[in-house]
Each structure stands twice: as structure tokens, then as C-alpha cells.
Amino acid sequence: MYSPHSNLLWENEDLTIVTPVNPHIPYKDGLHLVVAPKIDLSSAWQDTDFSSYAFKVAAKACSIMRTADIAPWFNIQANGNWGLLPGKKPFFHIHIYGRNKTDTWGKPIVLPMAPNTYNNKPMPEADQTKLKNLFKTELTT
């Protein structure tokens, strides 16, 4: 489900890849992308074939970004927890955190505890354009 609080980087008939307008981590620490299905899917185990496909697309996106020297490594995290927020219901989605070259490999993402407490600027337009072009030409599913 494509969020109006995100910028679309890539889509096909099944999935979208977006970058949040207010990402979970500052851009100096890395990038934040979200892979989300276009179907109503509350959890990965609700449709294991589809969720496996979504993880494959997320891994391929990471491979493309690594080859393009955008980030040397990534944290990939699956969520379906937004039903915890008022007015929201759970939906399956995958977060990709491209990590900064200066970070120690394996360093975990540290997120604030409360929702709506991220105060980070969006990915720069030039970098969004670069990813759009890379994904358009190289991310085939």
C-alpha cells in the first residue's frame, strides 16, 4: 500500500518501493525504503508465496544498490505491526535500511519508541532520481 507520506521509487502490478518523507533514520546514517504489496495482506504468513516474492524483490533492490555503491550493507526488516497505531490495521511490508559505509557491519538500527517521533529529512531528490532510474532498468521481477 503506497503511502501519501512517501515518494514512489518503483512499482509493478504487485508491489511498490517507496522512500518515506520522514524516514526512520537520518540520511547521513543511511537510506530507508519500504517494499509494500498492492494487495491487502496483514502478515507474511497469510500468503507465504507472495511474501517470499516480496522478500526476493527487496533482496534484489539491495543487490542493485550495493552494486551501484549506494550502500555497502543493509538491514531488512518485515513488519505487520501498524495495527498497534490508532486507526490503523496490520499490513505486511518490508523495511530496507541501507547503511552508511562508516557504520560497523551488523550495527542494528536504533529507532525511537513512540510513533511520529522521527524528525528526519527525506532522501535528497537527486538520490531518489538515481534509485528510480536504477530500479527501472535493473529491477525485473
Give the ranges of each region predicted by the language model.
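HIT superfamily nucleotide-processing domains
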Residues: 1-141
